[in-house]
């Protein structure tokens, strides 16, 4: 009986692990290949952390904090292995960049996600934008002022809902 229980436990564990395989693609540029600004080429990159064997998943675009003066992209541990993708974005920082450069970078990154997430298995109608501190500010500006997203050809006909709304 112990052997059967042990084998059954091992089988269930292996199946559970097989369902939770994640991949991270790092340092993907979200700016045009013809970009000539070296600082922009250096900073405007993103990492995509996504479930490899799952389709039609949601995606969170995550902007790091740092007061627009510091910080680097990272995948928060709280968002890992939750069944959705996380796109961590770097953007230009002050003093090398001035407002609204970081907002424009954020908009271009989100537009890139809208245009490309289906290639990774995600749904482009299930993209959420969030961040910490300065990253939260960038998320809010993109939600409130659609001109930034429109400048990069992203469909700005989306609804902003709070958690719990249908």
Can you name each region flagged by the protein language model?
Residues 1-23:
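Bacterial Sec-dependent N-terminal signal peptides
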Residues 19-55:
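N-terminal cap/lid segment of alpha/beta-hydrolase-fold proteins
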Residues 35, 72, 89-124:
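Catalytic nucleophile-loop/oxyanion-hole region of alpha/beta-hydrolase
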Residues 56-65:
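Short beta-strand element of the alpha/beta-hydrolase
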Residues 58, 81, 101, 105-108, ...:
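Extracytoplasmic/secreted proteins, especially bacterial periplasmic and envelope-associated proteins
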Residues 66-69, 93-95, 133-137:
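Solvent-exposed loop/turn segments at secondary-structure junctions
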Residues 72-89:
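Short amphipathic alpha-helix adjacent to the substrate-entry channel of hydrolases
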Residues 115-166:
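Primarily recognizes the serine-hydrolase "nucleophile elbow" in alpha/beta-hydrolase
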């Amino acid at each position: 009986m112990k052997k059967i229980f042990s084998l059954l436990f091992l089988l269930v564990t292996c199946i559970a692990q097989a369902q939770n395989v994640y991949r991270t693609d790092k340092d993907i540029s979200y700016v045009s290949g013809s970009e000539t600004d070296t600082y922009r080429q250096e900073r405007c990159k993103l990492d995509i952390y996504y479930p490899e064997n799952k389709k039609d998943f949601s995606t969170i675009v995550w902007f790091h904090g740092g007061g627009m003066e510091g910080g680097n992209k990272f995948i928060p541990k709280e968002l890992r292995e939750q069944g959705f993708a996380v796109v961590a974005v770097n953007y230009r920082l002050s003093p090398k960049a001035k407002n609204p450069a970081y907002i424009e970078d954020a908009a271009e990154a989100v537009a890139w996600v809208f245009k490309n997430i289906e290639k990774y298995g995600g749904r482009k109608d299930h993209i959420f934008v969030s961040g910490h501190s300065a990253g939260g500010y960038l998320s809010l500006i993109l939600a409130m002022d659609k001109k930034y997203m429109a400048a990069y050809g992203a469909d700005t006909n989306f609804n902003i809902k709070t958690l719990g709304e249908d």
